[in-house]
Structures are given as C-alpha cells and as structure tokens.
Amino acid sequence: MIRDLSKMYPQTRHPAPPHQPAQPFKFTISESCDRIKEEFQFLQAQYHSLKLECEKLASEKTEMQRHYVMYYEMSYGLNIEMHKQAEIVKRLNAICAQVIPFLSQEHQQQVVQAVERAKQVTMAELNAIIGQQLQAQHLSHAHGLPVPLTPHPSGLQPPAIPSIGSSAGLLALSSALGGQSHLPIKDEKKHHDSDHQRDRDSIKSSSVSPSASFRAAEKHRNSTDYSSESKKQKTEEKDIAARYDSDGEKSDDNLVVDVSNEDPSSPRGSPAHSPRENGLDKPRLLKKDAPISPASIASSSSTPSSKSKEHSHNEKSTTPVSKSNTPTPRTDAPTPGSNSSGLRPVPGKPPGVDPLTGLRTPMAVPCPYPTPFGIVPHAGMNGDLTSPGPAYASLHSISPQMSAAAAAAAAAAAYGRSPVVGFDPHHHMRVPGIPPNLTGIPGGKPAYSFHVSADGQMQPVPFPPDALIGPGIPRHARQINTLNHGEVVCAVTISNPTRHVYTGGKGCVKVWDISHPGNKSPVSQLDCLNRDNYIRSCRLLPDGRTLIVGGEASTLSIWDLAAPTPRIKAELTSSAPACYALAISPDSKVCFSCCSDGNIAVWDLHNQTLVRQFQGHTDGASCIDISNDGTKLWTGGLDNTVRSWDLREGRQLQQHDFTSQIFSLGYCPTGEWLAVGMENSNVEVLHVTKPDKYQLHLHESCVLSLKFAHCGKWFVSTGKDNLLNAWRTPYGASIFQSKESSSVLSCDISVDDKYIVTGSGDKKATVYEVIY
C-alpha cells in the first residue's frame, strides 16, 4: 500500500531541451534567471501542495481527537451507570429478602423461583432487547430529523440518550457506534474546511492512537495518509515528553496547570467591534468550558494548595482543593428558570440538577453523536467546530489520561475586547444553558451580559450610552512593568500611597518599588511560613506599617514594615492547616482569615488572639471581603455558597447557593452590589438586598480573583484563561481586556484607581497603568 509519489514529486520537473550534440550548450543570464524563476515557482507549488496535505492530516487528527473525547465521556458514563444499576439491584435484592419471609410458604417458593429466573438473562435476550431499543430510537430520530446527517451511512441519526439513567440507551449507543465504525471521516472534513485555516495555528491535537474501529474506518484513505500520521504521532510523543519536562522545570512540579492552554503566538489583533455593545456581529454556537470530571479535578484547579495532587501528571493542585459533590461530571452552569443563586434551592429539586446539562459538552464535538450526558441535538453541532480563533495549539499536550475538561480548556478560543492586548474577537457565546432566543440583543448580536430576574428569567442587558464613558470610567490599561518574582505569584497587594507592590509566592513575600520603573529587583524579601509553602494572601493595614501574610500553613505572620529592617512582630496560630484569604477591618483592629476547614477566624490584632470563629461553610472558605463601614462580611466557599455575616451581632445574615464553587468575590465600596467569580467561568453580580442579579460570560475558565475599584464604578476579574477583564458596575459592560501568558491568580487595584497589579502562573507580577 505504498502511495505513488510521482504526482507529488515528478522525476522530470521540466521538459528537457532537444539534444543537439553539435551545438555547444550555453546559458545567458536572462535564461538563467528564467530557469531560477521557473524552479522557484515549481518549489512554491510543491510547498503549497505539501501545506494542503499537512492541513488535511491535521484536521483529520483533530477529528480523531474529538471522537476520542466523545468515547472517553461515553465510557465514563457507562461506568457510572453500571455501578448505579449494580447498587440498585443490591438494594432490591435486600428488600426482596426482607419481604419474602412475610409471604405464605407456597408463595415464598414461587417468588424465590421467579426471582432466580429473573436473574438468568441470556445473551440472546440481551441482544433482542438492545435491538428493539435501537430500532425504536432510529425510528424516532428519523421522524424528528428529516434531513439526513451525512456522516452516517444510512442518513439516520444514531440513538440519542435521554439521560444518564438509561442504561439500555447507553448500550444501544455503544453497539450502534461499533456497527457504524465505517463512517467516512474524510467526508466530514469537507464540512470543516472553512475552519481549518483558522484552527490549525492553535489546536495541537494530542497523539492519541485511533481506536481499532477508526483504523478500519479509514481504509479507504490513501495509505500514505496514515503513514504520515504515524510519523507525526511519534514526533508529537517526543514533543509531549519534552513539553512536560520543560514545564516541570519552569513551574515547580507543574504547579501551574494552565500554562499550556494558550499559544503565545496566537493572533492579537484589535477587536473589530464597539466594546459598549453587549455582543458581536456574528451569531455563533453556544460554547463553554467543560464541567470538570472527577479524573481531573485536581489538575484543572488554578491556585496552589497543599492538599490535592493529580497523580497522572504528578501535578500540584492550584486551587483551594476543588471537589465534586457527585460522581458524574458536575454541570455548574446556572440556568434560566432555576434559582441558581437564590437564598435557598427550590424545594423538591435536588441541588445540582441542571436541565440543560447537554449544553455543557466537554468539547464541541462536531459530529451528531450524542454523549452519555444527554447532549441536546443541535443542527450546528454537525460538523461545525465552535472554537473560533486560535484552535490548533494545545490539544498537543492532552494525553488519554487527561479529562475532557482539559481538552475543552485547550480547545477554547480566546475572546478579545480591548486595544490593550487584543486577540481573536469571537467569543462564540460561551454562555452555558442559555436558550438560542436569548443569545442576542435587539441589534442581533450575541450577548455576554445577562440580567436574571427574581423568577430566573434571563435577558441580555442593553447597555446605556454612558456605559463606557464618564468620570471614573477607564478607557484602557497599559502594561508598564513586570516584576519577576521567580515563583508562582498567588497574592499581590499595593501600598497606599502607590509606591510599593507586595508579591507572595513560595515561602516569601517580595517588596518592589514601582515608583522607579527601571528597578528590576525587589527592595526586600520577607521570608515567612515554610520555604515550600505558598503564600495565599497578604494584606496591608491602612496605615501601611503592618503586613499580614497567610497561606498554606496554620500560622499568620504579622510583619512590622516600619522597622529599619522589616521583621515579624507576631504570629497567629489557628487549628486549620491553611488560610486561603484575608480581610482587615477599616479600623485596623480585627483581621478575618478564610480557613481551609470552612471556618472564618476573627483575630484581635492588638492582643493577637482569636476572638471568634464564624462557622457555616461546609468546605474550605476561599474568598472574603468586608463592607466599608466594617459592619458586614462576605465570604465565598468551595461548598458552592456565598454567605454574609453581621459583625456586630456575630451571626450569619444571608446565604446564596450556587451550582459551582466560589473562587473569588468583591463587595462594591459604594454598597449594593457583590461580584462573585466562580469555577464555572461565570461572574455574577448580586444585589445585596434584592433577588436581581447580572451574569457575565467573558471568561473561558475559572475566575480566580476579583477586585472592585475604590470608586465602585468598575471592577476587574482574572482567570485561569490568562485574562484580566475590566467590567462596568453592575451590568458588566466590558471596559477593557488584557491577556497574559499564563493563569492570572491574583489582582489588586491601587487606592487612587490608577494602577492594577496581577500575579500569574509564569512566576511574575504585572503592573498596569489605568488610562482615563
């Protein structure tokens, strides 16, 4: 099966001139130039054909990866369903055993025999049951979808799976997919040609070996396609090993899980639309990061933690230990009609039940196969890759052990809004669970900001004319300095007046003088906690003379910055193994620490004693903020709740329940609004006394930090997607957006609202000047 390469590499490139032995063979300069030009044109044509061949192979490899991810999710669903059904059978057997003794003797014998007969299911019976269900579902879909879907030989839609609870449907699907292993992937490729030019620069497909069925399916292809593919796979396997080695060297045991999900060379053109519009010119498919599956919860987190490790990559977790509450991948997107952030879940509806689970597929699989989690059939899913911009750069590092969440994060395209560091402006509606009729405002453009009323109705927000203009509203931000800390920067804070920046990494806080931009070295280094423990939060007292530092240790360090050499003047010890966040009361008398055990510790800074603990969070408390008058405290936790506390009475006031873990929050200095950043990539802005809220959708991954400007008119959020977003309070008009080279784990805004500092996973902090 060796492919004839004569078409691609003809042996005789140019017709030979007639042989004239009697006449000497001479070239003039003009003829030589013509021949060189001719040769160049030929090489150019050869290059073009090779380039097309390469693109074709790359696109087919991407298709293979999508199918692999689909099978991965399907096998996971089958495994869960199998265990579920086994548990149900066990319980029913126990009930039968308890009930049978109450029957009469003759009935007991009959029932026992009937139970034994019921347990004896033959393969013939199983095949008949599966065949009947398969036929019924084929017929139902033939009526429901009159237009044949080309990737299927008969034009019939494969059996859809109504829910994970249908084991027969799952079995039917698996057998159907096995039987249709000859589907022509190459034909499907035509449906994607318009996307490949755009995609090939940024999605690098992982070197996953195709399954046997797909190898059989591709026999009709030219043999060299696969030989080229196998060579490419071997090369990529080496690349993967090299990539993991280099990541380990630069990120300390792969602490930063997110550095590989963006291509540094991705296009960064300016956005082609007005930022005040709540949407874009081109309506697109819904797209969203995948729910995090249990196999990759640790590896998909984004700020350091001492607790969890991902065994498959020996990778430290970088969030406050992110947990799933159920064995199935969590669908953490708030949905219209469900009171996702109400004070309590609606009685009768189990928490976590999301009717639009299907819209949160782990990857925008461009074939009409449903996944085991009830994917809603969508016309655009058939052969339409929803990843818009850079989409061929980082499936390269996805191994079979990694979850679909990682694949989705890698395939997620970037969305650009601002002239700061613009990039691909198509965000493709990364809005989970929003019906198609809500994907735009009257101008016909998809929206990213939605108002959610008390009854759960979602409507795109029409921005007012002054959304992005007026006093106190920035125009953009300019990067003016980079502070090379040397470790992942998990905490930053700015002094008042704006002169020093404090960056917290592993085992120390470094102090930088930003009044001299040319100064590339820290003015001092404050060693605290243990050398291997990450600083998670550092807070300055309003007088600027005291710094409090907390992190992956049970102690908080209090630093005296007014001394000739900064020194630790006290340490506060709690029972929790880690502190995730700190807040200081306006009068500087009290410090609040978010503990990994879910408690909020209240410290008397004068007497250096623990005076109280607020108990309520059932998992780690991850973020905190305090009202300007010092009477109310807001905390967010990994238990999917945000709680408010009355500091005068020492009791909990409110509780807001979400379907996703809370990673960051900020309370507006002017009151009324609370912004919450979540694991599911949403930012929600809640009114503190009314049930209304806004839901904002520009982040591609976990929202790791959030901070309000001191004027209260705008706020910033940062995420695992490398983005710094600035939003208008409260409705979330995008003011500007900047993209960094790695996960942005922390941020702070100066008291005069003129500077922003961010800390990132590539071991540096970045200083921005806010331009008004």
UniProtKB/Swiss-Prot annotation:
Record-level Gene Ontology MF annotations: transcription corepressor activity
Keyword Repeat: yes
Region of interest (Q domain), ranges: 1-137
Compositionally biased residues, Low complexity: 204-213, 291-306
Keyword presence, Hydrolase: no
Record region (CcN domain): 206-275
Region (Disordered): 1-24, 183-359
WD repeats: 484-522, 530-569, 574-613, 616-655, 657-696, 698-737, 739-772
CDD domains, A to Z: WD40
Modification after translation: Ubiquitinated by XIAP/BIRC4.
A single Gene Ontology CC term: nucleoplasm
Record keywords, A-Z: Nucleus, Repeat, Repressor, Transcription, Transcription regulation, Ubl conjugation, WD repeat
Sequence ranges of Polar residues compositional bias: 318-329
Primary site of residence: nucleus
Location(s), subcellular: Nucleus
Spans annotated as SP domain: 276-452
Tissue: Expressed at high levels in the spleen and ovary.
GP domain: annotated segments: 138-205
Gene Ontology biological process terms, A to Z: mesoderm formation; negative regulation of canonical Wnt signaling pathway; negative regulation of transcription by RNA polymerase II
InterPro entries: Groucho/TLE_N (IPR005617), Groucho_enhance (IPR009146), WD40/YVTN_repeat-like_dom_sf (IPR015943), WD40_repeat_CS (IPR019775), WD40_repeat_dom_sf (IPR036322), WD40_rpt (IPR001680)
Annotated Basic and acidic residues bias: 184-203, 216-253, 274-290, 307-316
Domain remark text: WD repeat Groucho/TLE family members are characterized by 5 regions, a glutamine-rich Q domain, a glycine/proline-rich GP domain, a central CcN domain, containing a nuclear localization signal, and a serine/proline-rich SP domain. The most highly conserved are the N-terminal Q domain and the C-terminal WD-repeat domain. The SP domain is involved in EFNB1-binding.
Family: Belongs to the WD repeat Groucho/TLE family.
Summary of the function given for this chain in its UniProt record: Transcriptional corepressor. Functions with ripply2.2/bowline to down regulate transcription of tbx6-dependent gene expression. Represses transcription of siamois and nodal3.
Self-association and partners: Interacts with tcf7, tcf7l1, ripply2.2/bowline, dscr6/ripply3 and foxd3. Associates with tbx6 in the presence of ripply2.2/bowline. Interacts with EFNB1 through the SP domain.
Designated name of the protein: Transducin-like enhancer protein 4
Species lineage: Eukaryota, Metazoa, Chordata, Craniata, Vertebrata
